[in-house]
Amino acid sequence: MKNILFATSEAVPFIKTGGLADVAGSLPKYFDKRYFDIRVILPKYACMKQEWKDKMNYITHFYMDLGYKNCYVGIMHMEYEGIQFYFIDNEYYFSGPKPYDGGTWDLEKFAFFSKAVLSVLPVIGFRPDIIHCHDWQRSEE
């Protein structure tokens, strides 16, 4: 069994600004579950619809250093269409009215997300053989 983690800044049906969400939210369900354990991780944005946030289960939280900051990292979970989705919670970075703000703020936000993704893996007990980093927001990893 191969373990694959899709790390993305958006995925349907939870949050969508463009085609990235379609790929990251749809592709995982087409892998043969006999051979692949596919999981998806993305930010828990404040601008997500409340109906999705209400279905998430809190797993745990911890604090992680990012430069001079000690940052809260919450881990939420939901199964959707047979796929395990994890959501990184941090109100400081993900409380805006939309997923992307533009400019340098997005660089810091997704640097945090990139480090949080790697820090979450031992906590959730998932050891991916492949981490599929989607789009520029994941390129810091």
Predicted regions located by residue number:
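Catalytic cores of nucleotide-sugar-dependent glycosyltransferases that transfer UDP/GDP/TDP-activated
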Residues: 1-141
